[in-house]
UniProtKB/Swiss-Prot annotation:
Enzymatic reactions: Exolytic cleavage of the (1->4)-beta-glycosidic linkage between N-acetylmuramic acid (MurNAc) and N-acetylglucosamine (GlcNAc) residues in peptidoglycan, from either the reducing or the non-reducing ends of the peptidoglycan chains, with concomitant formation of a 1,6-anhydrobond in the MurNAc residue
Entry similarity comment: In the N-terminal section; belongs to the bacterial solute-binding protein 3 family. In the C-terminal section; belongs to the transglycosylase Slt family.
Source organism of this protein record: Vibrio vulnificus (strain YJ016)
Lineage, opening ranks: Bacteria, Pseudomonadati, Pseudomonadota, Gammaproteobacteria, Vibrionales
Protein name: Membrane-bound lytic murein transglycosylase F
InterPro entries: Lysozyme-like_dom_sf, MltF, Solute-binding_3/MltF_N, Transglyc_AS, Transglycosylase_SLT_dom_1
Amino acid sequence: MPIFNLHQLRNFLFIIATTLFLSACQIESKPTSELDQIKQRGVLRVGTLNNQLSYYIGPDGQTGLDYELARQFADELGVKLEVKVAFRQAELFPMLKRGDIDLIATGLNQTPRAIKQFRPGPSYYYVSQVVVYKNGALRPRNLKQLVEYQNAKTASEDEAEASNNAAANTLQVVKQSQNVTLLKSLQSDYPELQFTTVSDADNYDLLRRVSTGELRFAISDSIELSLAQRLYPDLATAFEVTEDQPVSWFVRRSPDESLYALMIEFFGNISQSGELARLEEKYIGHIGSFDYVDTRAFIRALDNKLPKWAPLFEQYSAEFDWRLIAALAYQESHWNPLAKSPTGVRGMMMLTLPTAQSVGVKNRLDPEQSIRGGVEYLRRIVARVPESIPQHEKIWFALASYNVGFGHMMDARRLTKRQGGDPDSWGDVKERLPLLRQKKYFSQTRYGYARGDEAKNYVENIRRYYQSIIGHVGQNSLIASDQEGEIQVIPPLENSELVAASDIDAAENEALSPDVGVSQATLTTEVQP
């Protein structure tokens, strides 16, 4: 029987240990795909911007079009979502280049320079870039006129006045933003076009400055302008600088296409399922029309009337956001507690007598009773909305019912289904509501004729008022609570500098250079899958 001596045993164990170690090294050195790394990490790291569309803190916590898309994408991967919120576009591309984030999820244009260094995902909506001015002020109709206005000087101007006018006429854009690249391309044809870059503001701030008269012109994308007009109705489009451009997410350019391929599949799936259309309807479906006179009156009411009634809206809003109830009340009565209609509805929430009696309101002209009763009536309608409708869209169906009646709303859903639409999508159903006026259609419904077009406009108006109130009271901020994450304050950067055609390359290079030392002013927050 063979016997191992101690020396042989040690050699044997050494050989086995060495073999196992080398095998482990080979396993560890084996490259894994980017997608596998994300799954092993258990976290998808997404960079986005803090604005009204991509990401903000709403009454129910984190929200935004890109936030919801990113959360669904993380769910599909089966990992947590880690959101890194930047305040400037210039921070996002370097973060992606360094590997601090896995993708950029915010509405960025597919500029040639960005596409050269990074890989865009599928386009999920389109925007045009426009020159913005204040309604009633001097309006340039094209770039040639804009340059003429910038360089004009009247005979009566002294040097100080001329300097002030030149500053006001100069376009301002956010430093290291994609608009820097756009204006460089425009300067090739209009070398006298002047613009200033600023470090202490975002695009929304610049639009506000145009509204207040501090600036005469700014550049904005069409959707951003539409959102800003709800608070600054004086803003208007002078002319379009570009045609509609695609916006998309971005990932790193790499031979490894695992993450990119799954992103393509993800957008294809949500496009086919209708989920993408539902989310776009939720966030931008209400911004198509703009009534200057109505918006001006509403902005005045925000300052003069809302402070008086806000406590009651907050007290009786129940499970609803009080700002939504305030928007509903403005649509009904313009916050007039004594409002009356020839049709018999009365009060702040314009209740009919039978409705008031059903919710325990004895005096419809008492604002407290009216608000309490209106909220209770809305709550009952929401409870009747079919469960098949997505939670975030139930309120729009309920508001349509508040206006036109529950039966007519259900008629519109059935009509939508007959026409091949989705009866659970507000975006589809709202387009069928106006058909309830036409005999060709209402003769085939259970409840007959209805002013469905008014119900559609009613809901869209409330949505616009709601977004304006959110912006006005300043509660769409980045920080919701200590649990949401920790924010780092952006240190002030250098003052505005005039960018001429000769030095614009430096600014553009900074925006996309992987080595630029940007301040990491980000909020990092984790979301469970």
